């Protein structure tokens, strides 16, 4: 039996507002996004990603399709939002939520790692993944003519248990993963508007820790257990002011950033402690002129790092000039140009001086010092829009060249994978061309939206003692048309195709050419004002190997009947063709992967919606 339920209740009384929200389902619709959406209004200065987990499945893959076709889940969500207005300009918000989810994922994966001695690996995974998340936030906001202030304190904790019964090329393997990430974060933003200038302040402070454990049972050959613990402290503070210079805006900003990480449980046998301080001076000048505007940014950074496994500190300066301009060419055409040279330290994830077991077969020696990525880029965008004829066109051309001071070397064997950093200059480059147009024929009720793109990527690959640059090409074209001339029927059709290939290299003499085609048709019918019937059909064809294709077709339909303003009935059917298997193949670098997963099959649901 498939169940999908959701209920909301709203109470408004004087200066108080209360919203209660609850949902649960087991019909392939994950509710995790409801928990993510509680996050705050974060900008470039207050956003910092949480450290990635060390443990992961080596091959588990999420299909590029709607979850309702494949997700075997039991999900529930409960949220409570309270707002109290002290005055017209100041409010207090309290949010709390709890999210629980259990999914069962099955797939079969064949991977081919290309080298002088090509290694082939197969896995039949059955993963049961359970997550429970609790979050709470307290936010205060003040908004007056002279002062804007926002402060939000958020706390969260997640419990995750995952078990994988895996049949592999080395026999039966059972994996058990436990993770418990916890975080406490405060974000403060403020703006002070004075007659002479504008002052702004932003601050983020976060405490984070994660305990992870991995237990592996090899069929008949014993077991292995690992435990990792990460404790991380992060803060970033920025102050800036804006004032007039020669009739334009000059922004002067200063940023101070600090992070401290402690990783315990690697094969080094001791804790890996690392930390850094970054000080940034950030001048930016905006120029407005007849027919356009320009912006010049000249930030200078100083970073100082310390590691427990190394004496002393390492430090360096980084300069990242950036300039862009927007030009109006006539009344219909706009050109946007940007050039930049960015130097950025890779500070997102913790460093270690030991080897970490990521899963039953993958071991990684992570970088033991902060690396710097140097990016040169240039791009041009031309935009044409004619409101009188309802026609628009965009052309984009971009080039990027990235240099890093290390790259990862991979060693693939039948029973393990080992990744280690090689500290040597490493570069990758890409350029792309994209063109799109849209035309609306108002009298005919017809719209046409078309696009095409081409991209070229060059990157270094190193595995099993072979190193070479890979040169990949990809082309894509798509066309979408819609027709809504009649008020009681709407039609839309989308079709797209992709082709990817690479040049000859040391890993392969073939071009690794793969093609796929996709199209979807949707019809919405409104025979009377309170009845809405819909149907959609989609088909995707993947080339899984040279000359061999897999086709996936899906047909869905439904009817919604609004009996009253407060009552509606609906019937929906998903996967009417009862497609049971999804297949695809793709290249990751030089390596080939074939993927197969079971689908949920045909399902129908009757729904009742009440408002009161």
Protein language model features and the residues they cover:
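Signature for the C-terminal beta-barrel architecture of outer-membrane proteins
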Residues: 371-377, 398-410, 414-416, 420-436
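Transmembrane beta-strand segments that form the barrel wall of outer-membrane beta-barrel proteins
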Residues: 1, 18-24, 298-306, 366-368, ...
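Outer-membrane beta-barrel translocator domains and adjoining extracellular loop/strand segments
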Residues: 22, 31-37, 104-120, 161-170, ...
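Membrane-proximal, glycine/serine-rich, low-complexity loop/turn segments characteristic
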Residues: 1-160, 175-204, 242-247, 289, ...
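Outer-membrane beta-barrel domain signature
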Residues: 65-71, 123-129, 173-179, 224-230, ...
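Face-selective signature of the C-terminal outer-membrane beta-barrel domain
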Residues: 83-101, 129-310, 321, 328, ...
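Residues that define the transmembrane beta-barrel architecture of outer-membrane proteins
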Residues: 2-5, 72-78, 130-134, 180-184, ...
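C-terminal beta-barrel architecture of Gram-negative outer-membrane proteins
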Residues: 489-560
